[in-house]
Swiss-Prot record:
It is an enzyme of class 2 (transferase). This is Probable peptidoglycan glycosyltransferase FtsW. It comes from Variovorax paradoxus (strain EPS). Pathway: Cell wall biogenesis; peptidoglycan biosynthesis. The gene is ftsW. It is a multi-pass membrane protein.
């Protein structure tokens, strides 16, 4: 054995290794990565970024997700505890804990599905993206077929799956994230050409939109359209072209609203929910949501103390869960929920930027697409509950009652965690 090596102490070896590691890291960090997509600045081409520090498992993202799921579970029980007294549910034999049990089972099933989704490499997701998109289209067609799709309150949105009702439009959100990201990767060289790159994606969105609007579910279509547009923009589509498309989409949605009498009525009710004409009609949910939030004041009336959930506020355990949170936890609780979702969205977007910095464009766009989805849907749901936006049937991600939504939210976040995991493997010098 070499005498110098034999005489080296453990501290000496550690310091040598530490010095070597620091030099290697500084060499890696000094290498710019040229990115073909937007990272938040004005430029697109030749954007430079470096991977962030190497850490272990992203525990913060997991714990924030767990916190939202747990709080949602508690609030679904609180908001639904009086529903079995409703004759509609009483005839079906629903007990006081029916919705809690169903929601807990949905969360457990979603957790198992998320664990399985996490095991799938991003290369596999990229290859499967077009096929998953086709499957989502077929399910959207199937739900419209009589005696196959389940109709509730005039909307045909669910497929019977035995232990749960599955909503294909939720799968379409995940499918659109993956498909749009893989599409942009394939079209990266011609992304500036409208007819070869942008138009085919627009046609795909229109096809999905026609199927979703036939249910009808305008809220889901809005989310899917924003996901596609967000990924196109983040993928580096010409800004001028993007804003022209955005303007056309806004005009299209405006035309849909203007041509539908009951949608126009919703807009009028949103503008004046307290009027005698709307207070007991289209403005009923909004007015009682505002009453609930107003009753909560700063610190709320306490967990379980909500009055509006006692058959006054419709859909208190789904679309208007935030109103019950505002009543029971007050402004403090609402601000905490907003803060958690802001952090979650920012972290997911950051993981996407980190993947792009490692030249993993598909993974980066998928993560950012999930961030756009969760951030936009949360914004719409909160805006509706607070009276800032017209009433729209969108749930609060990770919290509201709804098995399909919870399942797809968890799978989407599992994919993001997979992206983060692969980022860390690459930064350690491994392969994925």
């Amino acid at each position: 054995m070499n005498s110098a090596a034999a005489g080296a102490t453990p501290n000496t070896r550690t310091s040598r290794f530490g010095g070597w590691f620091r030099r290697a890291r500084s060499g890696i960090d000094s290498l710019p990565v040229h990115l073909p997509v937007r990272l938040g600045g004005a430029g697109i081409a030749q954007t430079k970024a470096t991977p962030m520090r190497v850490l272990g498992f992203d525990q913060a993202l997991v714990w924030v997700t767990v916190a939202l799921l747990t709080w949602g579970l508690v609030m679904v029980y609180s908001a639904s505890i009086a529903l079995p007294d409703n004759p509609r549910f009483a005839r079906a034999g629903y007990g006081a804990s029916f919705f809690l049990t169903r929601h807990a089972a949905s969360v457990a099933f979603a957790f198992i599905a998320a664990l399985l989704a996490f095991q799938i490499p991003m290369k596999t997701w990229e290859r499967a993206a077009p096929w998953l998109f086709v499957v989502s289209l077929l399910l959207l067609v199937a739900v419209l077929i009589p005696h196959i799709g389940i109709s509730v309150n005039g909307a045909r949105r669910w497929l019977p799956m035995g232990f749960m009702r599955f909503q294909p439009s939720e799968l379409a959100k995940v499918a659109m994230v993956l498909y749009a990201a893989s599409y942009m990767v394939r079209k990266m060289e011609i992304k500036e050409r409208f007819f070869r790159a942008v138009l085919p994606m627009g046609i795909a969105v229109v096809v999905v939109g026609m199927l979703v609007m036939a249910e009808p579910d305008m809220g889901a279509f809005m989310v899917i359209a924003v996901i596609a547009m967000g990924i196109l923009f983040l993928g580096g589509v010409n800004a001028r072209m993007f804003f022209v498309i955005a303007a056309l989409v806004v005009v299209a949605f405006g035309t849909i609203v203007a041509s539908s009498p009951w949608r126009r009525e919703r807009i009028f009710a949103y503008l004046d929910p307290w009027s005698e004409e709307h207070a007991l009609g289209k403005g009923y949910q909004l007015s009682h949501s505002l009453i609930a939030i107003g009753r909560g004041e700063i610190f709320g009336v306490g967990l379980g103390g909500s009055v509006e959930k006692l058959h006054w506020l419709p859909e208190a355990h789904t679309d208007f869960l935030l109103a019950v949170i505002g009543e029971e936890f007050g402004l403090v609780g609402v601000l905490l929920i907003i803060g958690l979702f802001l952090w979650l969205t920012r972290r997911v977007m950051h993981i996407g930027r980190q993947a792009i910095a490692l030249d993993r464009v598909f993974s980066g766009l998928v993560a950012q697409g999930v961030g756009v989805w969760l951030g936009f849907q949360t914004f719409i749901n909160m805006g509706v509950n607070l009276g800032a936006l017209p009433t729209k049937g969108l749930t609060l991600p990770l919290m509201s009652f709804g098995g399909s939504a919870i399942l797809m939210n968890m799978i989407a976040l599992a994919i993001v965690l997979r992206i983060d995991y692969e980022n860390r493997v690459l930064m350690r010098g491994g392969r994925v």
